[in-house]
Amino acid sequence: MPVKIPDNLPAAEILESENIFVMSETRAANQDIRPMRVLILNLMPNKIETETQLLRLLGNTPLQVDVDLLRIHDKESKHTSIDHMNNFYRDFEQVRNKNYDGLIITGAPLGQIEFEDVSYWDHIREIIDWSQQHVTSVLFLCWAAHAALYHLYGLNRSLLTSKRSGVFAHQRTREHFPLLRGFDDEFYAPHSRFAEMDIEQLRSHPELQVLTESDEAGAYMVLSRSNRNLFVMGHPEYQKSTLKDEYERDLSQGLSPEIPQNYFGNDDPTQQPIARWHSHGSLLVSNWLNYYVYQLTPYNLDDMSGRTPWESAVL
């Protein structure tokens, strides 16, 4: 959150040059504050686990956040009771005419299926298109990031010969981006996917900016130049045991998965996992919610169709 300082304080220029978020008394006095409204489209099989992971990150920010949960269809989920879905989730028709400050679209275990062959692909495209007019900023995670890059920019992924699973080191490729404030020069994040985007296509696209990447895992955080869409190719929301649970699930199904890299102690699956990414995940979501949602969204969400703060904002 910003530090409020007197108007024309000499330190302001220095602090701003160091990428410290400060706000003058005049600007602070004219700020209207209300809870942020965030919609979560949960595509993961275990709905409750994913809800908990994302709400944990949202709850770690200093902002009040009102969350709505969205399902892609009303078909019964294999891993979540129909009572839970009916009690806590909304259908798209219930939110179609609403506006939100933020939208999070999760990953999905669909990495080896062509986008057009996904049973609800048309629904995904419809929601992505809707979000570009009804949401200030959208955070796409893993499969959703690949799907959105394909739908919005025509950039397709390449399938991998084996699942990329593990915790990988990443580096910043840009400086002085609000989204990267507080990031270490090198940080870790989990990946669990069967596909990868071509990093050179991402780097050369005029509407996209690669902010962080990994020598082992490729592009990680990509931001649209409009500031509206953030594509995160991994799973910063994962809890400590998630990769372990996925690995053991695949073993039980006879899939012969590779051991997640840089995850178990000494890369030995009989040892406990080592969580190296929780502080990064918390900071990523906090920065997104603060700088790309809270700072850009209109106070009256009904005004969203009449203004585009993300296109004129200088962050």
From Swiss-Prot:
Major location (coarse): cytoplasm
Keywords: Acyltransferase, Amino-acid biosynthesis, Cytoplasm, Methionine biosynthesis, Transferase
Domain of life: Bacteria
GO biological process: L-methionine biosynthetic process from homoserine via O-succinyl-L-homoserine and cystathionine
UniProt subcellular location: Cytoplasm
EC number: 2.3.1.46
Swiss-Prot/TrEMBL site (Important for acyl-CoA specificity) positions: G111
Active site residues per record: C142, H235, E237
Pathway: Amino-acid biosynthesis; L-methionine biosynthesis via de novo pathway; O-succinyl-L-homoserine from L-homoserine: step 1/1
InterPro entries xrefs: Class_I_gatase-like (IPR029062), HST_MetA (IPR005697), MetA_family (IPR033752)
CDD domains in UniProt: GATase1_HTS (cd03131)
GO MF entries: homoserine O-acetyltransferase activity; homoserine O-succinyltransferase activity
Annotated site location: Important for substrate specificity: S192
Residues reported to bind substrate: K163, S192, R249
Protein biosynthesis recorded as keyword: no
GO cellular component, one term: cytoplasm
Keyword tRNA-binding recorded: no
Catalytic activity from the UniProt record: L-homoserine + succinyl-CoA = O-succinyl-L-homoserine + CoA
Role summary: Transfers a succinyl group from succinyl-CoA to L-homoserine, forming succinyl-L-homoserine.
Family assignment from sequence similarity: Belongs to the MetA family.
NCBIfam families named in the record: metA (TIGR01001)
Entry protein name: Homoserine O-succinyltransferase
Taxon lineage: Bacteria, Pseudomonadati, Pseudomonadota, Gammaproteobacteria, Alteromonadales
Name of the coding gene: metAS
